[in-house]
């Protein structure tokens, strides 16, 4: 981001792209369902990293572009887990759970709070795959927990951001917060 913002004339770029997935470990991503508290904790910790990433990228962008002519596009975000073992090899499919709803809500809150710079954000894939809003099986279709979070957040579209803050206790697991 620093190199782009420092060296590329603003009229040559509309935005800087950022990708971030809530991944436990890129080697063993963990299950999409039937996960334990440790996996849930690590997934949520990875999801909350979006706040840090957007804040740091925005600070660099503000340094070179205080008029906010260049946007931050979060091209891909969401939970990413290992493919279900019963699914054919080479096909990426993952079940969606309440953990994914929490990841979606946490991430959408970050985007709302940074709406002055984040002008576009795309869930990775919308149907059957990462952070899906719809799951299909032949002629059947279900709306996922992520879908319902998206539906709840649609009232934020073209709305006025009211800054709020709160204090809470940290959620910790062992020595990790």
Enumerate the predicted regions with their spans.
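Short, glycine/acidic-rich beta->alpha junctions
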Residues: 1, 52, 99-103
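Aromatic- and acid-rich polysaccharide-binding/catalytic face
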Residues: 2-48, 70-71, 75-85, 93, ...
């Amino acid at each position: 981001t620093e190199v782009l913002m420092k060296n590329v004339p603003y009229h040559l770029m509309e935005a800087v792209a950022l990708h971030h997935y809530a991944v436990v470990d890129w080697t063993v991503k963990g299950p999409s369902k039937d996960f334990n508290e440790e996996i849930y904790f690590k997934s949520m910790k990875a999801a909350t990293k979006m706040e840090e990433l957007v804040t740091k990228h925005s600070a660099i962008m503000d340094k070179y572009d205080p008029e906010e002519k260049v946007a931050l596009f979060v091209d891909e975000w969401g939970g990413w887990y290992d493919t279900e073992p019963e699914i054919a090899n080479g096909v990426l499919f993952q079940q969606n759970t309440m953990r994914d709803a929490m990841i979606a809500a946490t991430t959408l809150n970050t985007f709302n709070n940074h709406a002055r710079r984040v002008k576009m954000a795309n869930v990775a894939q919308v149907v059957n795959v990462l952070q899906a809003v719809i799951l299909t099986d032949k002629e059947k279709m279900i709306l996922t927990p992520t879908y319902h979070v998206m539906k709840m957040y649609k009232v934020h579209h073209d709305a006025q951001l009211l800054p709020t803050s709160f204090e809470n206790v940290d959620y910790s697991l062992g020595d990790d917060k």
